Structure formats: C-alpha cells, structure tokens
Swiss-Prot record:
GO CC term, one of those recorded: endoplasmic reticulum membrane
UniProt-listed InterPro entries: Cyt_P450 (IPR001128), Cyt_P450_CS (IPR017972), Cyt_P450_E_grp-I (IPR002401), Cyt_P450_sf (IPR036396), Cytochrome_P450_fam2 (IPR050182)
Keywords, in A-Z order: Endoplasmic reticulum, Heme, Iron, Membrane, Metal-binding, Microsome, Monooxygenase, Oxidoreductase
GO molecular function: heme binding; iron ion binding; oxidoreductase activity, acting on paired donors, with incorporation or reduction of molecular oxygen, reduced flavin or flavoprotein as one donor, and incorporation of one atom of oxygen
Lineage: Eukaryota, Metazoa, Chordata, Craniata, Vertebrata
Cofactors demanded by this protein: heme
A biological process from GO: organic acid metabolic process
Protein name: Cytochrome P450 2C21
EC number(s) given by UniProt: 1.14.14.1
Keyword Iron: yes
Amino acid sequence: FIVLVICLSCLISFFLWNQNRAKGKLPPGPTPLPIIGNILQINTKNVSKSLSKLAENYGPVFTVYFGMKPTVVLYGYEAVKEALIDRSEEFSGRGHFPLLDWTIQGLGIVFSNGEKWKQTRRFSLTVLRNMGMGKKTVEDRIQEEALYLVEALKKTNASPCDPTFLLGCAPCNVICSIIFQNRFEYDDKDFLTLLEYFHENLLISSTSWIQLYNAFPLLIHYLPGSHHVLFKNIANQFKFISEKIKEHEESLNFSNPRDFIDYFLIKIEKEKHNKQSEFTMDNLIITIWDVFSAGTETTSTTLRYGLLVLLKHPDVTAKVQEEIHRVVGRHRSPCMQDRSCMPYTDAVVHEIQRYIDLVPNNLPHSVTQDIKFREYLIPKGTTILTSLTSVLHDEKGFPNPDQFDPGHFLDENGSFKKSDYFMAFSAGKRVCVGEGLARMELFLLLTNILQHFTLKPLVDPKDIDTTPIANGLGATPPSYKLCFVPV
C-alpha cells in the first residue's frame, strides 16, 4: 500500500510539474485533474459533442488532457484548414493512438511517421495509380462487383433484410481484387470471417471502453475488456494476409505484376541489399491491413448509412432515380463518365458523406516540430485532434448543417458545386490514400443499386431515426431493415 501511495504521489507530482511547464505555451482549456486529466468532462460515447461544448468556452484552439498527455483540439473550418492545408508539413505527423500502436508498431501507411510513412504512402499511391490505368482498371473491378451485388440483392426477393452484410461484401471484394487479384463468393467461409473481423473491429473501436484504453493504455491493457477481442481479430487478419503473400511468392512473375502484393514483393526484392529499406515483409502485411481497414468498413458503413438516409428522404431518392434513368437508362451500367452529367446524384453522394460525418474527430495528427500556432507554442510530438464535424457542419459552408440537403452541393442552376468545407476524407498531406477509390465505389455502387431497385422502408419515413448509435472513432448507424424492390 505504501509503495502504491508513493507511486501515485510521484505521478501526481510529475503531472503538476509537466502541466506548469506547459502553462503559457499550450492553448487554454479546462483544468485537468491529476492522472485522469479531463476524462470526466468528455462524453466517451460522443466525444465530438463534448468538444463542441468546450469550443464554445475556449474558442477554436484549445487543450484537453486524455489522461496525462495534452491534446490540442482544432475546431472549425478556419483552424482546421490553417493546420492541415496551409501548414500541412508541420501537422503531418500521426498522433499517438495506443490501441493500435501495440499491434502496428509504426508500420504501414496510416499509423506510420517520418520516412517510413512518406515512402510507403508514395509507393502505394503509385501502385494504385498504375492499376487504375491497367488492362483491368479499378473502375472495371468496381463495376464488375456492382453487378454481383445487384444479383445478390435480387435474391432477397424484395423481402425485409438487414443490408449490413451485402453492403460489406462489395467494397471488401473490390479491395480483394486490387490486393489479391481475385474476389470471393459472398458465401465463402474465409471471406465471411474476414468481413466479420472488420465490422467487429469498427464497432469495438467506437466504444467508450476504447476511448478509456487510449487515455490509460498501461493501466487497461492488462485488464479484461473488448480490446483483447480486437487484438485477436487483428492477429487473425495478419495470419490471413500472410498466407496470401506466401501464395503470391510462389507464383510471382517479376515482369508481369498482377496486383498490389506483387508490386510490393518486387520492390522488396529490388531493395534487399539496402539495410535501411522501408520495404519489408512486416511493412507489407501492415500496409495491406491498412488498405483493407480504411477501404472496407468505412465504405460499407457509408453505403449502409446512406441507404438509411435515403429511406428517410424518399423525395431525394426519387430525383436520383429519375436522373439515373434519364442519363444512363436501364440497359447499361453507370460509369464514372456519367457523373459529370448527373449533378444531383453527385450532390447526394457528397451530402450523404457530409451529413453522416463518418469520422467525427479524424485520426490524430501530431506536429513534426516545435511550432507557433496563432499565439500559442506547441511542442514537437503534441497530439492534434482536428474536428471534422466542426467543418462538415459549419454554417458558413453549409447553411442549416443539421439538415440533409443535397442543395449544399448545387448552385442556382442545378450544377454540382464543390465546397472547400467538404473534408470527409480529411485534408492535406494525411488525406485518405484511398479517397479516389472510395469516391468511385460510392458513386458506382449507389447508382447501380438505385438503377435496379426501389428502396422500401418497413416504417413511415418520418419515424426513421438516423442518429448514430456510437460516435467514437467512427459514427455507427442504427441497425435497420428494408426491402429491395426490383424496378
């Protein structure tokens, strides 16, 4: 007991010293308690809402303590733009994320830093660009998968169904075709297991328990909890990816790379004599996991949430279908060239992403050097939270931001109107590496669904609730059922 008291006293003393040292440098914020910081002032079920209230008191730049470490929060378009776009290099670091630091070990694209991040990201973008111009382009793969999805939806026979599973299959298979060269049947056992891991991981990551884990990783890591399920899921995903890599190694043709794995294996071979090379087998595994994690569950959740919003707004859905049938017709599949002739549909796809606000607080950034931001001094390595909610729901960019209105992206002539406030994929040097892919998937999959089906709700549209059931790392829509009635 005495040892425990001494340890706690040391921690409190260190905390107070550290806090005093930072006074006059970091932005203002609520007074943190020793050890636990401001965790009692943060609603871990809806961090975004708590940050909104704090911004009312402390302005667009303030400091909160998740545990003992300070986090600088940037709230509103002006502050977020100044950091991520105007000063993108200084804010390009990836912030501390204890939940995944344990397993990722600083590898891959999403959670890496420095030269490892720059080289891996640059290489991955180049490969995706090359595949976009190949014999079988990324658009071809999405269109092919859209047809499989339509056939699967037809098999529901217009009966009530939960769309979660089927809307997860299509984006996951698109990633599979890019990474592994082949897609899976929707009843494939390995495929179903992989899908379940991604879905469960996102649900776990959005819980209050995980917010506490990130604040107190050393304390909670050894306690029972859902984080152990997540670690187990990730380990099984790594095993699945490793097996696919082994299969590729056995059939690799250096002069004819088939997919992302082949390109990466060739790069590893070319740099095998460079001991400082960032292209290793471990980095390949984590990079693939990053691409899957970022490209599967986010897109499928957006589709699932999008259909729920469209059920709530049948008038909007009817206008989209009219435009699809007028521009595309019924006898061919929509393609990306059609988008420029379909401003209303394009606006609806953008408004869905803005309205649902899928990643409310972005992934954490960090500053790569000591900087002066406005009148504050922010030390190198400080974690930065950029509130995407505050940008996507900014009244200056989107009048009546809490209303679902495709008019947010249309001008007075009905033409599509871009908005600098649209940061659904973040912005700057850490903008989502799969943004181009996700934009194609959302447009092509949604238009294919609405080309072939009328969405029939099981309740009156007025009674449909679109409020997320969880709002941690990601916004999770409530579960629902609908009928896909063939047109």
